[in-house]
Structure formats: structure tokens, C-alpha cells
Amino acid sequence: MDLENKVKKMGLGHEQGFGAPCLKCKEKCEGFELHFWRKICRNCKCGQEEHDVLLSNEEDRKVGKLFEDTKYTTLIAKLKSDGIPMYKRNVMILTNPVAAKKNVSINTVTYEWAPPVQNQALARQYMQMLPKEKQPVAGSEGAQYRKKQLAKQLPAHDQDPSKCHELSPREVKEMEQFVKKYKSEALGVGDVKLPCEMDAQGPKQMNIPGGDRSTPAAVGAMEDKSAEHKRTQYSCYCCKLSMKEGDPAIYAERAGYDKLWHPACFVCSTCHELLVDMIYFWKNEKLYCGRHYCDSEKPRCAGCDELIFSNEYTQAENQNWHLKHFCCFDCDSILAGEIYVMVNDKPVCKPCYVKNHAVVCQGCHNAIDPEVQRVTYNNFSWHASTECFLCSCCSKCLIGQKFMPVEGMVFCSVECKKRMS
């Protein structure tokens, strides 16, 4: 497929999740409606991950595409109908007998994802070592956490040009090369094992104390080495605390098998969130999630959340922006050369600020222009003028004077306060 056809096929999937309720805004949001180029809801401005959107198949396609053309193809299966790679995530179902008064019932727990190991007891141990609120039990807070992290850590628009907004053929080609590079140099999936299992494979892989590669002179020397291996102290690469031999540890092949992590410590070095499904990116002796690895390699547009592959972009408020995406967060008007105000780290044009965000003067009850000086006390504001910042009793100007605030009113003296009480 040539680049022109790829560009034509691009689309952000605006029908996906349409009308889904917002888990954060509740009834304040009319339902999810994707903005035409931002990755947020047009109604409430929250991301798709904050909405109750059923995405299991879509997320499996996304992760499947991530693993395509890598050594992790065993984790994907291609659909016969269209050849789309699908992530074969490991689902674990545990059954526990529960004693009742008359008979024994079975309590079933389904994990929406579990480490793909043959030893189910090891997988179960791994889950128990995660914080309860992050265990991906179906229908739980942990399952919602996993869903949110899949969206946040592995954005589809960081690997698939068709999920991006109006890329040029040159940008598509550059993005494809970037994705190919990180798949071959940084992408990995954690491996759950017992520390002693890796130790048994020998010092050539583990590079641990006691790993003398010289040939022993006698059988007694070999026995000493064996005893030394048994006394090996394992410590977590993240928290540096010791690990128990019988507890599962996570290894990352790209980091080398001399490093291991507690299950709860296998986190992104930037956002410190659990690496979802143990999918990691390794760079400069650090673990990253997909998002923050890409951020370390390319600028990201604060408007559309996509990586910037264009040579021309703008920087404002310590953030990067596509030239066409440095827009008002409320009305999408372009802000180049215009006055704007930052509201919750988002740029807003002056008219929208006055209309939607400006504080109201307690004196004249009009919105306070962002360029005008004001006086603020607690949650109350006034124009810093002789017409507005006045004693609520005698109308004396209080600019530069001591005053007594009382529930939105200000007084120049105790006497004036008493007259109004």
C-alpha cells in the first residue's frame, strides 16, 4: 500500500464509544463524543479512557499491532478474515471453594490479564503481590485501572499513522521508521520467574556474585561455589530492597538477567505506574511505558497528543504544539499572535476566558479582564480600581489600605462593619 493510500485511510474512529457515560463527570457529560482532532470528549473534555467505553477488542488489536514484526509474535494471533493481528492476552480464572452452612459453593475470580506462565501458582503469587486496587479482576477497580493504563501508556497514535490527524506522506514514512526502530531496540515484555530458577541457569546469564567463570581445580571447590549460589542475596533493581527466593520476580530481557524487580516495582521511571501487561521500553538503564519512551525521543503536541514528526512546530508554556494545533481549548481558534490565558495548563483565547473562566468583580459584578489588575482575597476578587475596591459601607477607596473582609464584603473600619451588621 503506497503512502497516499495510507493517508487517505486515516481516521480517528469518531463512532467508537459514542455516547458512553463519563466515569469522572457522571451526569454532567452528555456522553462521549470524540473531538475532531483532539483525543478528548467534545462534551466534557475528558479523555476516552475516562469514559465507560467497551474497548477490549480494540485494545487487543492495538497491542497485537505493537507486537507484529517482533520476537513477541507468539503473543498474537491473526484473524482469518482480514489478517489483523490480535493480542492473545492470558486470562486467568481461579476457583476457590467457599464453606457455607449446608454445602460448599465455588467462588470464581477472573483476571482479565495474567502473566503468560505455565505455573498458575506462580501467576497467582504474582497477582497477590500487586496492590489490591491494581489487580485486574473482572469488574473491579483494578480492571478499570488496567484499561486506563492501556490507553494512557500505549496510545494507538504512537504506533499507527492511520490513528493520527492529517499526516503528510513524509510524516507517515518517518513515523513508520520510528516505530520500526523502537520495536527492534527498546520494546520488551517482562518475564515472571523465581530468582532461583534464573540463578540455576548459571553465571553467564545472571552475572551475580559468586559467578566465577574459571574452571575449579577440585570437586570441593565446585561444592563451595554451589553453596555460595544458595546464599545469593537478591535485591530489586527499583527499590533496592531484598527479595525472597520463593517470591516471583520480573525480568526484562533488554535490561539483562542480572536485574530483577518486585511485581509492584515494575513501573515506568517517569509516571511510576505499573507497566501494563508488563510491556516495557528500555532506554539508558531505565524502564519506560510506551508513552514516556516516545516522549523521550520525540516532541509531543499538547493539543492533539500525537508525536510531532514535522520539522516545524511551536513551543509555548513549556509545551510543544503542531502549528495548526496551538488553538483555544474552548473554541479551537488559532492563537498565533493572539492574547491567550492558560487555564489548567490549557491555552484559552481572551473572549473565551472572559465568557467562561474569568472571575467576577465583587464591586461591579462584571467579569475581570485578564489584562486588568485585580485584588483577590480568599475566593473573592475586585477590579483594582477606585470604582470597585471600596468599603461596603462608606464607599471609601481601599487600594493600599487595611481592610476587614466579611463574606464577600470589605470594610475600612470596625465602625463601618457594625453599621452593616
Curated annotation (Swiss-Prot):
It is found in: Cytoplasm; Cell junction, Focal adhesion. SMART domains: LIM. InterPro entries: LIM1_Testin (IPR034958), LIM2_Testin (IPR034959), LIM3_Testin (IPR034960), PET_domain (IPR010442), PET_testin (IPR033724), Pk/Esn/Tes (IPR047120), Znf_LIM (IPR001781). Changing C391A: Abolishes localization at focal adhesions. Residues 92-199 form the PET domain. Ubiquitous. GO terms for cellular component: cell junction; cytosol; focal adhesion; nucleus; plasma membrane; protein-containing complex. Residues 133-164 are annotated as: Disordered. Residues 234-297, 299-359, 362-421 form the LIM zinc-binding domain. GO terms for molecular function: cadherin binding; RNA binding; zinc ion binding. Keywords: Cell junction, Cytoplasm, LIM domain, Metal-binding, Repeat, Zinc. Residues 155-164 have a biased composition (Basic and acidic residues). One of its GO terms (biological process) is negative regulation of cell population proliferation. Interacts via LIM domain 1 with ZYX. Interacts (via LIM domain 3) with ENAH and VASP. Interacts with ALKBH4, talin, actin, alpha-actinin, GRIP1 and PXN. Interacts (via LIM domain 2) with ACTL7A (via N-terminus). Heterodimer with ACTL7A; the heterodimer interacts with ENAH to form a heterotrimer. The N-terminal and the C-terminal halves of the protein can associate with each other, thereby hindering interactions with ZYX. Scaffold protein that may play a role in cell adhesion, cell spreading and in the reorganization of the actin cytoskeleton. Plays a role in the regulation of cell proliferation. May act as a tumor suppressor. Inhibits tumor cell growth. Belongs to the prickle / espinas / testin family. This is Testin. The lineage of its organism: Eukaryota, Metazoa, Chordata, Craniata, Vertebrata. The gene is TES.
